[in-house]
Amino acid sequence: MFKKKYYLAFVLLATLLLAACGGKEGSTGDGNKGSSEGSDSVAEQVDYKIIGIEPGAGIMKATAKALEDYENLADWKLVESSSAAMASELQKAYEKKEPIIITGWTPHWKFAKFDLKYLEDPKGIYGEAETIETFVRQGLKDDQPSAYTVLDQFFWTPDDMAAVMVDIQEGADPADAAAKWVEDNSDKVSEWTNGADEVDGEKIKLAYVAWDSEIASSNVVGKVLEGIGYKVELIQLEAGPMFAAVAQGDADGMVAGWLPLTHADYLDEYGDKIEGLGANLEGAKTGLVVPAYVEADSIEDL
């Protein structure tokens, strides 16, 4: 009887010890897993990927250079996509509060919709603030002086542009969003049309690249030109062909030249074949952008 009780007590004690060890081991395993996931670096969380836009864009070339010049980015990959696809990836990550790193620029509606920040760029790869500039074909001043006057005097602010971009992003047709802005900002528009005579159905072609900022500006300028009697055709092209179209006379002008960085190569190639009318927007910026909740403030933190 004594042996039987002793045996049962031993079995019970062994069972309790095994259960305790198993529970501790399971707890430690889960804890380690959580700790590992929680301590993943930003680089690991985004799988060493930067979400880019169209290949060939100035910001893509700058980012490729950043991957070369920043030692901590040696194992990173720049993912080519489009401005629309980049914005879609940003929105999906932001809604889940997941980290993401994108090639970004302002003005852009994403800064109005999301809490974002630029990563500091100690090496100055992305340069200082950019301007968006207007270019026209040679001879436009003589052929279509009223259009030339409007394009020469067109100038607005990042806030102006953002208002149009946000309306478009929220579902408005670009032409309708532009028409609304023109109607609501008649004083500013009158400054652009000052000295421009009305015309009777003359045709004019404006080239633009399919970035949200340029969709906004090109549609606004198009509406202003329509207001003084022009029949306006907007031609969507990639950045290089946009400059080429103006240089070759296939387009009369464009308000989409980002300088001195983004479109520098195209200006080098076509600059002597087009006429520059100066900045139509100041304070534009490009760089690597992350949601504000991402625990990194500099490219060197990645």
Which residue ranges define each predicted feature?
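Ligand-binding "clamshell"
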Residues: K97, K110-K123, A264-L277
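Periplasmic-binding protein-like
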Residues: F111-D152, A279-G287
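Bacterial signal peptide processing site
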Residues: G22-E25
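Bilobed "Venus flytrap"/periplasmic-binding protein-like clamshell domains
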Residues: D40-E71, K77-A87, A175, G201-I228, ...
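Ligand-binding clefts/hinges and TM-proximal coupling segments of bilobed small-molecule sensing domains
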Residues: K49-I53, A57-A62, P145-E191, D297-D301
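A conserved helix-loop-strand patch within extracytoplasmic ligand-binding domains
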Residues: E37-I51, R137-G139, T149, F155-P158, ...
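Short, glycine-/small- and polar/acidic-enriched structural segments
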Residues: P107, A216-I299
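C-terminal motif of bacterial Sec signal peptides marking the signal peptidase cleavage site
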Residues: L16-A20
